[in-house]
Amino acid sequence: MRDELVWIDCEMTGLDLGSDKLIEIAALVTDAELNVLGDGVDVVIHADDAALAAMGEVVTEMHSRSGLIDEVKASTVDLATAEEMVLDYIRTHVKAPKTAPLAGNSIATDRAFIVRDMPALDSYLHYRMIDVSSIKELCRRWYPRIYFGQPVKGLTHRALADIHESIRELQFYRRTAFVAPPGPSTSEIEAVAAALDEGKDAPGPSDSASAPPTG
């Protein structure tokens, strides 16, 4: 059974949907085991000088350091072309529309810009999303040792590199926070479900987030 995930990361001139511009989008498709399929796609989208001049100081410094501003100025790719390039790659590995969830970090922000600027791409994706940031936040509360032990991110603020880091982060959580394959037995699952139905606390590990992790 095929069960792909579509990983997307966007770089924008800011986070305001009313005024900011989408200036880079990258995509990678993985299988259910988080193996990357193909080379992916990374597209820098042209924006005019006025849009770049309107960026805040922090965003300007970030995109200058990464080299993205110079690439945006030099790019001749518009939004429609970028959307088709991303869809061409995704369709190579995800044959049926509305079957593959969107995955990434804080992915709702990226999806909002995709909905606004790339409706055909949004329509091809499943409505469900897998947000690695949600797992991060749960680990911070439930398993702080895992949270504080996660791999250091490069923070390049370039779309394709950020996707690779998000995939690596989910691989880390899978090996540390999730039950090892093949998972609990049917009887163990039934016991947890029954306990929750009865309003009881289901048995499980504890790892207080109120203090730095030990051991």
From Swiss-Prot:
Residues 196-215 are annotated as: Disordered. It comes from Mycobacterium avium (strain 104). One of its GO terms (molecular function) is 3'-5'-RNA exonuclease activity. SMART domains: EXOIII. Keywords: Cytoplasm, Exonuclease, Hydrolase, Nuclease. NCBIfam families: PRK05359.1 (NF003765). Signal peptide: none annotated. Its main location: cytoplasm. InterPro entries: Exonuclease_RNaseT/DNA_pol3, Oligoribonuclease, RNaseH-like_sf, RNaseH_sf. The active site is at 127. CDD domains: Orn. 3'-to-5' exoribonuclease specific for small oligoribonucleotides. Belongs to the oligoribonuclease family. It is an enzyme of class 3 (hydrolase). It comes from the Bacteria. This is Oligoribonuclease. The gene is orn. Its EC number is 3.1.15.-. One of its GO terms (cellular component) is cytoplasm. Residues 202-215 have a biased composition (Low complexity). PANTHER family: OLIGORIBONUCLEASE, MITOCHONDRIAL (PTHR11046:SF0). It is found in: Cytoplasm. Residues 5-170 form the Exonuclease domain.
